[in-house]
Structure formats: structure tokens, C-alpha cells
Amino acid sequence: MADFIVKDLSLADFGRKELDIAETEMPGLMALREEFGASKPLKGARIAGSLHMTVQTAVLIETLVALGADVRWASCNIFSTQDHAAAAIAASGVPVFAIKGETLEDYWAYTDKIFQFADGTCNMILDDGGDATLYILLGARVEAGETDLIAVPQSDEEVCLFNQIRKRMAETPGWFTKQRDAIKGVSEETTTGVHRLYDLHKKGLLPFPAINVNDSVTKSKFDNKYGCKESLVDGIRRATDVMMAGKVAVVCGYGDVGKGSAASLRGAGARVKVTEVDPICALQAAMDGFEVVVLEDVVQDADIFITTTGNRDVIRIEHMREMKDMAIVGNIGHFDNEIQVAALKNHKWTNIKDQVDMIEMPSGSRIILLSEGRLLNLGNATGHPSFVMSASFTNQVLAQIELWTKGADYQPGVYILPKALDEKVARLHLKKIGVKLTDVRPEQADYIGVKVEGPFKAEHYRY
């Protein structure tokens, strides 16, 4: 029986061609293959990967394999898979379980499958959003007697998650605890997943070390900002074909993702307003030239609304009922709870095309909802460009190597890769875009108290 689930294996050739192109735009990952391909530092690592199954992720997967790892993969979002990329990975012999538009039930079943290694346990997790980590740790707590944790689901997603946990416990008693105890570490890709890890550690519920990849400078200041700057408008255009020039757009949140999103919309000619709860970010937005407002003051006038906060209930049902006819509503934060999509269930929905729905309000006005409130840049388009994802994924590979080869040096907790590795990731990407670094002379290095080879900034420096 084939150890993969993809939409159409015949798409593998198309996927392979796109992988070949992506490799030329991902110098960091290709450099790691060259540096570590012979020594295979990930030999023996059995990595359960939960991250958007895109062309760029396929290059990451093949890099992990080239470095010796045994890998099983699922997407971390029901809409983000590129089916031809999944097919290419399946055809290469790597077990992958991902279909664009999969159901929530399938999503959690596929998450379960990434842990089904031949000997019964994985020993590493590569996560994006924290769902793979959540699945194992929540299941282990239920096995330990905390059955109330899955007694009352609060969403459709929790219904499917809790059912999958019960199913696995019935089929293989003690499975979650066995998996948890075998895991040596997790590397986490995104802001939301990192929040989960810090919360687990604070409560004493994180049993293994975790590396916070998101807060590597070469991830958060590049993927989150420059990636969103290109992919947000791409997703809106593919979904709606609307002209953004002259439109009023509201970006909720001005962290790194919000900064990139506001720049994306401004670059398309939109008149951008920003909402913020953090006074520092609000001041940044204002000094970047954006009007900082509260949502209630602009909800009737704006044409496009984008959430970027990582928080819940940012755009609520009362906001959507006040929006102008055919306002576009979308999210580029990791989860779908930034917009109160569940509150729209009893309204009239008209599906326009995949991941584009028109929803009629009681007043007769309509909104266009993108990707059901999930990541629109991946649901309605193909996500960030390969080059910026190379920086993020180079950090992921380095984090996996660090945890696998030096795991004994780490206690349970959340860690960040050292500055020297952050600078290495940046350095690996300079030649591709024609950057030439100025060399620091020894007397200059002495003057500012650094080594000639770096790192050039203190750990606390904010870029």
C-alpha cells in the first residue's frame, strides 16, 4: 500500500520542474546540502514535518533527506498545499499526506500519519503553527488521565482533533506517551506556534527543547516582512481581480507581518490605514506614514480588510455587518480565528471559486471572504517567493541539526539560534543578489569589540 496521500500523482513531473526552478532561488538550502551532504548530520533523525506543502517546502524536505534524515510530511493548513509539489515529493519516495482543500477531519488524520514511522516513533518535529506538537502533547495528557481536555470542543477544528485523539488511543493505547518520550526536540516556524511553545514552557508542560526559528532575524525580518510584501497582494489579485489602486485598505496589526502587508497594499496603490493595540507598533506605523485608526471608525468606508495579528476575534461579526457592499475580508495570520468566520455560518454563502466566498448580510450587503479566514497568501496564491523562504528554511535545517546533534546540551525550554548562525544564513544569500560585503579591519573590530568574522551585533540588538 502506497505510503502517501496526494491529489494526483501524475502532477509529479510538473512539480519536479518547479522544484528545479526553486532550487536556483534557494541558495541557503543548496549551500547546506553542499556543506553537510557528505557528513549527513541528521542521520538517524526521524522528522515529523507539519508545514505548508509548497514547492519551497519540497526543497526543504529534500535538503533534510540529503542530510540523512528520515522524513514524513503533512501540510499545516487545509488550503496551503500545492498539489504538484506534494506529488513530486511522493514520487521521490518521501511519505507525504497533503491535498489542497482537505477537510479538517483529513487534516488531523494526516497529522497523525506523519508520526507513523516504521519503528513506531518519530524523534524530531519540524512544526509550523504548533499543531504537530499540540497533537502529541495533548494526546499524552489525555492518556495520563486528563480526559476533560477533550470533553467539550469549542470549534469544528477541535471536534476533529479530539476525535482523532480518541481514535488513536483506541487503536494504540499508550501511543501518544511513547511518541512524546521519544522526541528529542522541535523547531517551530511561525509566531503563533512560538507563542504556544512559550505558554507550554511557562506552565511546565514542554517536555523537550524547542528552537524558536521565527525569531531568528533572518526569518522574522525577512519572511514575515518581505515575504508578505510580495505574497499578500498576489493572493488578493488571484482571488478577486480587483484593482487596488485608490482603494482604502485596513491592515489590522503592525508587527513584522503587518509591516509587510501594509507595504504590499501601499505598493499596489491602496490608501492604507492601520489598527494596533501596541503603542510602539502604532507609533512605527504612524511614522511610516500610515494613518492609525480604530476599526470601528473605518469599517463602513474601507474596501479591503486584512488581519495580521496572531490574535483572535479581531474582525467580529458586528464589523462585517457594517462593511460596505462587496468589501474584501482576508487574513494572513496563521490561524482562522482572527476573523469570526464561525459567526457567519447562518448567513447566505455563495462560493465564487476555490477559497473565494461571497457572504450576504441580513441588510443585503455582501462581503468577499478569502480562504475562509485562513492564510490567503497560501490559500488564494502560492505563498512567499522561494528566495525569502530559503532564509527561513535554512534556519529550520540548522535548528534541526542543532537539536539532533547537541540535544543533550539542552534542557526543556524555548531557545533561539545564536547570532553567528543568523549571520551565516544571511551571508549564504548575498551572492545570489549581487551583494558585496565590506570587510572589517582588525583595528575596527577591536574598536567596537567584535571579531573580524562576526557576529557584528549583540544578542539584544534589534534590527
Swiss-Prot record:
InterPro entries: Adenosylhomocyst_ase-like_sf, Adenosylhomocysteinase-like, Ado_hCys_hydrolase_NAD-bd, NAD(P)-bd_dom_sf, S-Ado-L-homoCys_hydrolase_CS. It catalyses: S-adenosyl-L-homocysteine + H2O = L-homocysteine + adenosine. GO terms for cellular component: cytosol. One of its GO terms (molecular function) is adenosylhomocysteinase activity. Its main location: cytoplasm. It is found in: Cytoplasm. Pfam families: AdoHcyase, AdoHcyase_NAD. Keywords: Cytoplasm, Hydrolase, NAD, One-carbon metabolism. One of its GO terms (biological process) is S-adenosylmethionine cycle. NCBIfam families: ahcY, PRK05476.2-3. PANTHER family: ADENOSYLHOMOCYSTEINASE. May play a key role in the regulation of the intracellular concentration of adenosylhomocysteine. This is Adenosylhomocysteinase. It comes from Cereibacter sphaeroides. The lineage of its organism: Bacteria, Pseudomonadati, Pseudomonadota, Alphaproteobacteria, Rhodobacterales.
